[in-house]
């Protein structure tokens, strides 16, 4: 699956992007691109998978429809978590001071392209 070009385009299009990773349901990296350390990006991807799993359980218990995206904002960074399918998800990390709206727009575009590659 050619994920690297899609992830590269995502990171290049989002000002302040530090990295993007596609991981499977176990939190294992399928592919990743970033200016941050590869190991750190893999750890972030795995941890955000745990958050995604927990949020999916909450959404299911509430009887709501499927979870589309999660945004985590800290003092220094923002992280976007988006499911691609039931088994794969995208994590995008970026600087806190940069444009979250642009990041969400580009991540949604990337999700559509990733979905086409996976399904």
Task: State what each model feature region is.
Residues 1-119:
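Non-catalytic interaction/Regulatory regions outside core domains
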